[in-house]
Each structure stands twice: as structure tokens, then as C-alpha cells.
């Protein structure tokens, strides 16, 4: 079963993306942050 999670920017801590995940480990993805206006590492938030 897939869990719904939100991804937050590692610099400004803004929650920019919502997605589903099916793996047990925490997600870390490089995505564009519209607040920072650059591509940053986004981490899974509970």
C-alpha cells in the first residue's frame, strides 16, 4: 500500500510537493523550490 507524504525543502523548510511512496526508506529528491528559486534537496516529512 502506498503512503501519502509531503516533501519539504531542506533550505527554507517549505512543503512544496505531495506524493505517494511505496518504499520504507525516507525519500530525498532534488526538486525545484519556488520560494528559494533554485533546485534544492527535498526530504520527506511526516
UniProtKB/Swiss-Prot annotation:
The set of disulfide-linked cysteines is none
* Alphabetized SUPFAM superfamilies for the sequence: Zn-binding ribosomal proteins (SSF57829)
Q: Which UniProt keywords apply?
A: Ribonucleoprotein, Ribosomal protein
**One Pfam family recorded for the sequence:** Ribosomal_L33
Tell me which GO cellular component terms the UniProt record holds.
cytoplasm; ribonucleoprotein complex; ribosome
Which NCBIfam families does this UniProt record tie to the protein?
PRK00504.1 (NF001764), rpmG_bact (TIGR01023)
Return the protein name: Large ribosomal subunit protein bL33A
Q: What organism is the protein native to?
A: Mesomycoplasma hyopneumoniae (strain 7448) (Mycoplasma hyopneumoniae)
Amino acid at each position: 500500500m502506498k503512503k501519502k507524504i509531503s516533501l519539504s525543502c531542506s533550505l527554507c523548510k517549505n512543503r512544496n510537493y505531495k506524493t505517494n511512496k511505496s518504499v520504507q526508506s525516507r525519500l530525498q529528491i532534488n526538486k525545484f523550490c519556488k520560494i528559494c528559486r533554485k533546485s534544492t534537496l527535498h526530504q520527506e516529512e511526516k
